[in-house]
Amino acid sequence: MSQMTKRALVASLKDLLAEKPLDKITVTDLTEHCGVNRMTFYYHFKDIYDLVEWACIESATHALAGQKTYDTWQQGFLQILQAVQKDKVFVTKVYHSISREHIENYLYRLTYDLMIGVVEEKAAGMTVRPEDKEFIANFYKYAFVGLTLEWVRTGMKDDPAALIERVSTLIHGDITKALEACRIDK
């Protein structure tokens, strides 16, 4: 029931975003549109931005399910970009309504979790300092988030599959090369 209520609030938020900007939507607007009381909203979320973050995390978690390995990261990122494109109105309105820092922090957390999993997988059998693995994951995190934000900022015109293909071509084998260069057991 709890997840259903959260999803209903997200659906109401998306409907309301079609009518007005995020900063003009109130909790009262949301709860009246959704047919729940304000206490129900506050039981689940501290504010509207918390609801936005939950909606983004929920969408990304669904897109990344089972796609956190070296062989599948491309599919995971493709599914994220496709989900973003599918929700273009929501994403664009949110992108232009809240601080870039808020969006970046969310994307950084999401992308780091994916990349550190890939780095750890490729580092199996190597002795690499944890801070070097983190540095490699952070490097790719910043690259992917920068590309994603630029893609959103420019209206999501590029085909997500073509974008992922270009990124994949650029980094093919580079994570392993970076780990090899950082090995302390050579």
Specify the residue positions occupied by each region the protein language model found.
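An amphipathic alpha-helix adjacent to DNA-recognition modules
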Residues: Q3-K6, V10-K14, A18, D23-V27, ...
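Amphipathic alpha-helical segments used for helix-helix packing
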Residues: A55-C56, A83-Y108, G117-K122, L149
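Secondary-structure edge/capping motif, primarily at the C-terminal ends of alpha-helices
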Residues: Q67, V91-Y95, K122-G125, W151-G155, ...
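Amphipathic alpha-helical segments that line or abut small-molecule/effector binding pockets
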Residues: Q74-V89, N138, G146, A161
